[in-house]
Amino acid sequence: MRFLLCLILLLHSTVLAGGLQWEKTEVAIEAFEGGGKVPGELKFTNTSDQPIRIRAVPASCGCIVAKPEKRDYAPGESGVIPFTYAPKRKWGTRAYRVYVVTSEAGAPYEFRFVVTETRR
């Protein structure tokens, strides 16, 4: 009984903690030969009761550059992180990772980018 009570309290506090809620965590990109850079954005909302700071947005490949328009988001505030994919002229499908490091405790948010480059 005591274990169940502790588990309920733990889950309840986790839900209340909130954080950044993302519109999606997987991004599909299609790039075509001669088409140039492909823009996009990661959309989110701060569902916590605390301000959250975006500290860094590293990617597993230099072909993806993501730069937040601002760093600090108040509780309830929504935002976007624009990104650009620069085609590498490597035809086919590959996967990359983008991470969003915030002021929250724990691991950074992770996004999977599935890129398909097609030769015309």
Functional labels for PLM-detected ranges:
Residues 40-46, 81-83, 96-101:
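Buried hydrophobic-core signal for structured, non-transmembrane domains
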Residues 23-29, 39, 64-69, 81-84:
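Short structured motifs
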Residues 3-13:
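Sec-dependent N-terminal signal peptides
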Residues 91-119:
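Terminal connector regions
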Residues 16-47, 114-120:
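Beta-sheet-dominated interaction scaffolds and their linkers
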Residues 49-77:
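Surface-exposed binding patches on compact interaction domains or structured appendages
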Residues 34-41, 88-97:
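Short, solvent-exposed loop/turn segments enriched in Ser/Thr/Gly
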Residues 47-50, 89, 104:
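Short, acidic/polar linear motifs in exposed loop/turn regions
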